[in-house]
Amino acid sequence: MQVWASMDQRMTLAEVAAHARRAEALGYDGLNVPDAVHDGLLVAQAALAATQRLRVATSVLVVFPRSPMNVAHAAWDLQAFSGGRF
């Protein structure tokens, strides 16, 4: 069984990084990030860059205003950047 943390969508990117580090230190397996106030992929990158083992996923990613190719490239890059944690 895995336990994942969530976060407040109004957090700044600096707060996201601190929250992710805290979740990792507390032993959470992952962090679900929203796609609301900030771009969900950018929020995910902030969390991934701040941690070593925490897995990160978007709770929801609004795809209608985004190019499918850009979403695929960004997801691929986040997966590679994080060593498979996205």
What are these regions (language model features)?
Residues 34, 61-67:
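Glycine-rich "substrate-gating" loop/helix at the edge of Rossmann-like oxidoreductase active sites
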Residues 2-10, 15, 65-86:
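Flexible, glycine-rich active-site loops centered on histidine and acidic residues
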Residues 1-58:
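N-terminal beta1-alpha1-beta2 module of alpha/beta enzyme domains
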